[in-house]
């Protein structure tokens, strides 16, 4: 009996011993970082106070990737949010007037605000991360609509303390659940939707859609409203705004959700985003149109696009190497994963580059752009590739799209190929610039998202 008790105690102590040993080695790694106090406090909490190994690993995941996430520096953003709050509370203003006023104040006082950013590791507190880890971990452990997730899925679909850069570090899980989660208190008990991921997700989506009184205005409206107080109150947002509300509201309710996007949007217009849930079957079900359509109802069966990226918390290693080595760094973002082949048929392409053009280039990185409906800037960069053995090489490109390859000549990006169509059979057909601008070529025939 004594030996049995001793063995039991040893088994009980194993998680504690594991966390303590990890904490000791991890803290030594951060010793030289001047901002290590909050990190050490977080690791200490999950090694001594709450020694659950998976929580410790979740904390490590957050810390290891935090350098890829940014917030506004300084307090000027709060002046902007205060102004936005006063606009949204003014019932005498129409959504158009609210939007136009916000655009005016952005251009006159806050247009340079996104340039002044700071890494989250210099701002975030251990208490805030503990709040997010504990909240999401409890949902993963107890909610029937989240229990299908593996631990690795949990790290990306539920855990992150933010969904996009510049999102306010506030208690959005509690705030948005209070706005859109009342249905969880009185669920409809039936034999079909009850406690399913899709059933709960559509309940949250429907409540958000009906309570926000959204008035879709798809023109520029100033800096995005990224605080949990303002997000549910905006009436003039665009599709990405409401897709963000969707993914945050779902995560607040314990529904596994992520945010996907394309750099070139509807019919070669602006970029767009949508949210995705992971169902009980492990299927990834898309929202198609922000909050206004049912989840999983089909995803644009007639469309195709150049690229689709998933907003992740983990830093994309390909993008990280690019940001370190490129002589010209395009602002792709460090935490975006290429998932184009989950939506479309794709091709890896190799484009021969003339020797005389190669001599003018100052970097091994090259770029691929897709056509957009903008006379001033008719091409939008969608990805980067590399120049190897005299060829510009690009991977995982969407088919039946009009492209052009570009390179860095020391001053900026310049075309290094003629425009070309990547056909369904992966055949590359070059077309002249005159043909691209000719009415004879219906370049919008192959609509993107």
Spans of model-derived segments:
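Short Pro-Gly-centered beta-turn/loop motif in secreted/extracellular proteins
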Residues: 388-413
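Structured interaction patches on ligand/partner-binding surfaces of diverse proteins
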Residues: 409-438
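A short, amphipathic beta-strand motif
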Residues: 347-357
């Amino acid at each position: 009996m004594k030996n049995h008790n001793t063995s039991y105690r040893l088994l009980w102590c194993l998680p504690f011993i594991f966390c303590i040993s990890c904490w000791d080695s991890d803290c030594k790694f951060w010793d030289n970082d001047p901002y290590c106090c909050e990190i050490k406090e977080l690791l200490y909490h999950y090694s001594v106070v709450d020694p659950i190994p998976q929580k410790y690993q979740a904390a490590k995941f957050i810390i290891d990737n935090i350098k890829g996430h940014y917030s506004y520096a300084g307090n000027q953003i709060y002046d902007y949010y205060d102004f936005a709050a006063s606009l949204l509370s003014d019932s005498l203003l129409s959504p158009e007037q609210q939007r136009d006023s916000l655009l005016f104040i952005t251009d006159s006082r806050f247009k340079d605000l996104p340039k002044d950013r700071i890494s989250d590791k210099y701002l975030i507190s251990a208490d805030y991360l503990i709040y997010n880890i504990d909240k999401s971990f409890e949902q993963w452990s107890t909610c029937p609509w989240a229990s299908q997730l593996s631990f690795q899925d949990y790290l990306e679909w539920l855990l992150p303390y933010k969904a996009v850069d510049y999102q306010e570090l506030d208690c959005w899980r509690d705030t948005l659940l209070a706005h859109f989660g009342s249905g969880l208190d009185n669920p409809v008990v039936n034999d079909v939707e009850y406690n399913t991921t899709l059933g709960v997700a559509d309940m949250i989506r429907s409540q958000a859609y009906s309570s926000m009184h959204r008035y879709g205005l798809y023109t520029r409206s100033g800096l995005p409203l990224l605080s949990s107080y303002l997000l549910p109150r905006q009436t003039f947002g665009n599709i990405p705004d409401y897709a963000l509300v969707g993914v945050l509201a779902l995560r607040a309710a314990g529904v596994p959700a992520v945010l996907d996007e394309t750099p070139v949007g509807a019919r070669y217009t602006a970029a767009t985003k949508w949210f995705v849930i992971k169902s009980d079957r492990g299927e990834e079900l898309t929202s198609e149109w922000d909050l206004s359509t049912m989840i999983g109802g089909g995803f644009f069966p007639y469309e195709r696009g150049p690229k689709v990226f998933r907003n992740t918390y983990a830093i994309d290693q390909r993008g990280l190497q690019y940001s370190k080595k490129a002589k010209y760094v395009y602002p792709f973002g460090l935490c975006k994963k290429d998932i184009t082949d989950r939506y479309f048929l794709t091709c890896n392409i190799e484009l021969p580059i003339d020797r005389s053009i190669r001599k003018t280039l100052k970097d091994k990185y090259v770029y691929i752009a897709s056509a957009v409906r903008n006379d001033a800037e008719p091409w939008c960069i969608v990805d980067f590739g590399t120049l190897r053995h005299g060829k510009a090489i690009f991977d995982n490109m969407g088919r039946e799209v009009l492209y052009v390859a570009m390179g860095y000549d020391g001053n900026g990006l310049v075309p290094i190929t003629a425009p070309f169509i990547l056909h369904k059979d992966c055949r590359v057909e070059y077309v002249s610039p005159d043909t691209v601008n000719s009415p004879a070529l219906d370049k919008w025939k192959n609509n993107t998202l």
